[in-house]
């Protein structure tokens, strides 16, 4: 499974490498607020790209359908399918899952439906909204495709829809945004978190304020003064009960933060200080960076509540797909060195991806 996946990912990235060129990435017309990844391409030029996107989607969908039954969550979904969706046993299961189970005569067809929707929405979001299509594919294939589309398939559909919907925050189109978030919520309830985020800053971010918040979160995380520790001193029963549900007790042992957590936080600060230049070429930069910052804050502030840290960090972390891709836009002069930095950030996650594929990840 690992060899097949790496071969497929390498083939996709080699064939799409021309999309990383300066000519393609800087094709957006700065005078237009509405962003199009291939804005200056004529219809005849776009068609082969979209055909290629379709072929990429087909290959990835096949990987999802015929994945190993040793992957995390595979047995759970197979058991739920046999129980008709598990609607009588799990009250938290979404109605969409029960509906798709009823529409699927076999478990493989269920996997095919979910894969088509999740991979399709991700590819559509990338080719529509990404500041650098090739780099977004690198981020997606190096980690999030395996984590979400191949394992957490319900949340994958919701996040794919949100990747497309983010453009409506900048365009100030509340109805299509809320409609898409509502559809995403039908596939996974955690998408409700994105409803109020329509009102996040969309024009600019104060680099000093947000850098200060990130640095404070770094200090709290590395000194074991994160949310779980602070919650000990809040005399509110429901907070105590909520934290206990994740920890099981009030003896907090922080998950060890590695150098990667600090590195990702400093990437956010770098993007903040270069946001003005990035926005010139990528109008969606502010909400994308906001989601990326939220992700990093979750990783740092919930370090002593590993379940929340992973769930929320990975949820908002999906926007790494765009955040890492906009990193090279900080400087046209140093575009290619910065692109290498983005690639190296992705390579840090490849060992985890291999473990997920092998079914050995903890």
Short names for language-model regions:
Residues 126-143:
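Transmembrane-helix signature of polytopic, membrane-embedded enzymes
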Residues 113-129:
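Transmembrane-helix motifs of polytopic, lipid-linked glycan transferases
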Residues 34, 51, 70, 75-79, ...:
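Alpha-helical transmembrane segments and terminal signal-anchor/GPI-anchor hydrophobic tails
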Residues 162-176:
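Membrane-interface transmembrane helices that cradle and orient dolichyl/undecaprenyl
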Residues 178-180, 190-201, 212:
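Transmembrane-embedded, aromatic-rich helix segments that form part
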Residues 20-115, 352-362:
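TM-lumen/periplasm interface segments of multi-pass membrane proteins
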Residues 150-156:
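Short acidic/glycine- and proline-prone juxtamembrane loop motifs at membrane-interface regions
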Residues 215, 332-351:
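Signature aromatic-anchored transmembrane alpha helix within multi-pass, membrane-resident enzymes
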């Amino acid at each position: 499974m690992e060899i097949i996946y790496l071969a497929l990912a390498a083939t996709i990235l080699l064939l799409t490498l021309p999309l990383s060129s300066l000519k393609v990435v800087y094709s957006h017309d700065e005078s237009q607020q509405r962003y199009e990844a291939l804005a200056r391409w004529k219809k005849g030029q776009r068609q082969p790209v979209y055909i290629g996107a379709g072929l990429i989607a087909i290959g990835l969908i096949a990987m999802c359908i015929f994945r190993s039954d040793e992957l995390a969550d595979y047995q759970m979904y197979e058991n739920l399918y046999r129980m008709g969706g598990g609607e009588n046993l799990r009250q938290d299961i979404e109605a969409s899952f029960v509906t798709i189970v009823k529409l699927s005569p076999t478990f493989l067809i269920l996997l095919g439906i979910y894969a088509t929707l999740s991979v399709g929405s991700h590819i559509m979001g990338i080719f529509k909204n990404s500041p650098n299509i090739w780099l977004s594919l690198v981020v997606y294939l190096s980690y999030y495709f395996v984590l979400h589309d191949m394992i957490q398939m319900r949340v994958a559909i919701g996040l794919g829809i949100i990747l497309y919907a983010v453009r409506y925050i900048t365009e100030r189109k509340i109805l299509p945004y809320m409609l898409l978030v509502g559809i995403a919520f039908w596939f996974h309830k955690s998408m409700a978190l994105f409803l109020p985020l329509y009102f996040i800053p969309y024009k600019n971010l104060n680099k000093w304020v947000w850098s200060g918040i990130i640095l404070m979160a770094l200090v709290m995380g590395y000194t074991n003064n994160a949310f779980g520790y602070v919650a000990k001193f809040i005399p509110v029963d429901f907070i105590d009960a909520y934290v206990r549900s994740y920890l099981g007790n009030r003896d907090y042992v922080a998950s060890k933060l590695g150098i990667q957590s600090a590195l990702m936080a400093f990437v956010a600060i770098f993007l903040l200080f270069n946001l003005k230049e990035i926005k010139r070429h990528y109008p969606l930069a502010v909400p994308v960076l906001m989601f990326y910052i939220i992700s990093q804050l979750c990783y740092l502030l919930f370090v002593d509540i590993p379940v929340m840290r992973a769930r929320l960090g990975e949820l908002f972390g999906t926007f790494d797909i765009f955040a890492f891709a906009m990193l090279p836009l900080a400087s046209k002069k140093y575009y290619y060195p910065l692109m290498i930095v983005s690639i190296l950030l992705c390579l840090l996650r490849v060992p985890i991806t291999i473990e997920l594929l092998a079914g050995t990840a903890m």
